[in-house]
Every structure is written in structure tokens, then in C-alpha cells.
């Protein structure tokens, strides 16, 4: 935690800021609290504001959204906690005024810079009305960048989260039964990680007949469709260890081996994963990872989901989305994006997800990794092979 605060205060000094105002929400199973969590260790079930002064001798304050959440927040937070009230921006303004920053410069850290999710409009209006001479600078993207390289302690937490995620993935393959509705699989996934001491984060899945596929990515909402012999279940699963998450993608084949078309798609994904894992090393640029995955395009597939993304508590750079398909088949002479270079100890999800051009068939094969000198180290123990369920 001392390292994190040091990095945050260095950011404030670079921008001549007297404090940061950090906003979080409970979206995505509390993982939209990532920026607040990083400086407090608290994952709130509602909204939060952290007022983080630049001066190390001045106490920060975490304002939680609901009064009855204050006692629990005080048990987990490493900074003092107060209720933000029904006008939390007024509480933030009062704190800034007490710090002598009513006419100063503060940095705003929102939820997610990629999608422009900052503090709510009404809160911002209230803050401006209370402190009309306050200068607010958005530093969300730069702050999120501080979290990209993981500490030794964070990597240890990610290993635990990966093991919890493996437990959930294994439970799907072992417990799925013919006639079971999809939504029961969600209970299996979340129940397995909960029983092992984890928290649910992501449980996306889609079941369909191997010989009549009708979807290329796992669904965010399980249906009441009943599992049948000869089905494939495509998955994306993350379980968390107090904020830090693993992520795994494996297809599960029910009561039958993969058909030739599914086997070919799986083998393409596996080859792409291996090449990408070798390319994801310190100093690697985005174009090198796109080139490593070009086997997907060379075999007539595209992708739908991200090819890789930074991870840990939430998704952050580096991110390579489906626009990379425009560079396949690979041509060394054609310009390709550079993007942020990969750094040692970044946590990155590698997830080749080949889909057919008509987007009726697809699978994901991936894992959370940590960047090391020799390439990406997979944190998961589930084999890179089709999972067979007896059904």
C-alpha cells in the first residue's frame, strides 16, 4: 500500500495537484471500484469517493454511499471512512475546503478512461457550485496506468484468484448433466468459487449443439435452454480473491468428443495462444502480438472479443480488440499499430477467440498470465485441451 500511495503522490506532483478525488461504483461485481480499492483495500457495494491528499502527513478520507455500509467499510479500509451523505459531492467539497484546496487544483480519477466513465454529472455540478474556483483535471487514464504493473504481493493474490477460477471451471466440466438448464451452470460456477473462499466476478457461458452452432461468444445472461448430449459450452470465467481475479476460457464438450470443425477451431486457438504467450514479453509492442496471432486469420477465422487485455481487478491497457483482424493475413510491409509496450510483471489475459465469418460458431481459449522475461507465465492449472463432460 505504501508503494501505491507513493506512485499516486508522484502523479499529483507531476500535475501540481493538491489532492485526488477518486470515484468508484459497484458495477461488474464491484470491480468498477478498482481505482478506489487500489488505495484503500475497500470494495464497496454502492458508490464511493476517496479524497487523497498529496501531502503524506494529511489523512485521506473514504466516503461510502450508504450509511449502513460504514461499519463494514471500516473493517476493510486502510484509510478513515465516513458516510458521504445524500449529496456526496458536498462532503467532498467540505473536505477539500478543510484542506485549503477550495481554490486549488485537484485530479479527478473516474471509473474507466476507455469508456469515459467519470464522476456523475449531478455530483460534478454540485462540486462546482460549492467550489466555483476549484480547478479539476481528469487523470483517470494516467492513474489506471499506475496499476498495470503488479507488485509481488499482487501477483500472489492473482495466483490465488487463478486457483479459485480453476475450481469453478473444473466444476462445470464435472457437474454438468444432460437436461440441466444453463442457469444452473451459473450456480455451479459461483458456488464452487464461493465455497473455496472466493467471490464471483464473471460467469459467461453459451451452450449449443456442436452440429448446429448459433453463437460465437459466451453470453452474459444464462438462458433456460437445457443441456444435451453433443453440446459444446463455451465459457469465460473469473473468480476473485478480494478484488483480484483470474480469468480462464475453455470449451466443454458434453458426452461426445469435439467434431472435426470444432477440433480444427480449438487447435487454431491453441496455436495462437502458444505463439502469443511467447511474444508477450517485456518490451513487446502491440504489433508483435497481432503478428503472433495471425494464424487465426490465415485459417479463415476472425475474432469477436478482445485478443488480449490487461487485468487484475478490472480491464485496462494494453488492449487489442477485434480491429486486429484487419492485419491478417500478416504482411510485414504493412503498417500496424504499436500501442503501449508490454512491461515486466504486467498481468495480461491472452484469449484467442476464433469465430467463423458468419459469427455462428466460435470458442475462446485463454488464461490470465504474468509477463516475464521468457514470455507470458500462465497462472492457471487447467490444461489447454478440450474439457470433456460425461453429461
Where is each model-derived feature located?
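Active-site neighborhoods and metal-handling regions in enzymes and metal-associated proteins
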Residues: 1-391
Amino acid at each position: 500500500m505504501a508503494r501505491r500511495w507513493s506512485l499516486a503522490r508522484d502523479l499529483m506532483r507531476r500535475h501540481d495537484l493538491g489532492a485526488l478525488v477518486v470515484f468508484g461504483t459497484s458495477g461488474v461485481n464491484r470491480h468498477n471500484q478498482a481505482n478506489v480499492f487500489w488505495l484503500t483495500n475497500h470494495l464497496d457495494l454502492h458508490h464511493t469517493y476517496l479524497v487523497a491528499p498529496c501531502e503524506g502527513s494529511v489523512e485521506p478520507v473514504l466516503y461510502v454511499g450508504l450509511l449502513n455500509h460504514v461499519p463494514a467499510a471500516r473493517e476493510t479500509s486502510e484509510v478513515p471512512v465516513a458516510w458521504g451523505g445524500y449529496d456526496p459531492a458536498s462532503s467532498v467539497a467540505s473536505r477539500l475546503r478543510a484542506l485549503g484546496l477550495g481554490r486549488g487544483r485537484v485530479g479527478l480519477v473516474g471509473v474507466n478512461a476507455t469508456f469515459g466513465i467519470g464522476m456523475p454529472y449531478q455530483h460534478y455540478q454540485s462540486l462546482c457550485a460549492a467550489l466555483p474556483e476549484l480547478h479539476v483535471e481528469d487523470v483517470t487514464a494516467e492513474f489506471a496506468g499506475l496499476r498495470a504493473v503488479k507488485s509481488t504481493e499482487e501477483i500472489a493474490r492473482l495466483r490465488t484468484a487463478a486457483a479459485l477460477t480453476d475450481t469453478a471451471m473444473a466444476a462445470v466440466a464435472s457437474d454438468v448433466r444432460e437436461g440441466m438448464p444453463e442457469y444452473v451452470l451459473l450456480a455451479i460456477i459461483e458456488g464452487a468459487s464461493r465455497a473455496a473462499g472466493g467471490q464471483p466476478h464473471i460467469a459467461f457461458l453459451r451452450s449449443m449443439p456442436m452440429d448446429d452452432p448459433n453463437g460465437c461468444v459466451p453470453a452474459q445472461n444464462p438462458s433456460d435452454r437445457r443441456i444435451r448430449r453433443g453440446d459444446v459450452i463455451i465459457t469465460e470465467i473469473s473468480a476473485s480473491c478480494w478484488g483480484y481475479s483470474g480469468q480462464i476460457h475453455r470449451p466443454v464438450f458434453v458426452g461426445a468428443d469435439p467434431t472435426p470443425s470444432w477440433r480444427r477451431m480449438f487447435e487454431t486457438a491453441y496455436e495462437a495462444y502458444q505463439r502469443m504467450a511467447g511474444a508477450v514479453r517485456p518490451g513487446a509492442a502491440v504489433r508483435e502480438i497481432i503478428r503472433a496471432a495471425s494464424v487465426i486469420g490465415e485459417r479463415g477465422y476472425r475474432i469477436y472479443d478482445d485478443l488480449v487485455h490487461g487485468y487484475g481487478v478490472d480491464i485496462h491497457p494494453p488492449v487489442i480488440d477485434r480491429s486486429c483482424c484487419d492485419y491478417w493475413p500478416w504482411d510485414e510491409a504493412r503498417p500496424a499499430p504499436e500501442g503501449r509496450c508490454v512491461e515486466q510483471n504486467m498481468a495480461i489475459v491472452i484469449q484467442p477467440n476464433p469465430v467463423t465469418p458468419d459469427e455462428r460458431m466460435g470458442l475462446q481459449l485463454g488464461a490470465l498470465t504474468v509477463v516475464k522475461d521468457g514470455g507470458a507465465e500462465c497462472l492457471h492449472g487447467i490444461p489447454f485441451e478440450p474439457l470433456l463432460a460425461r453429461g
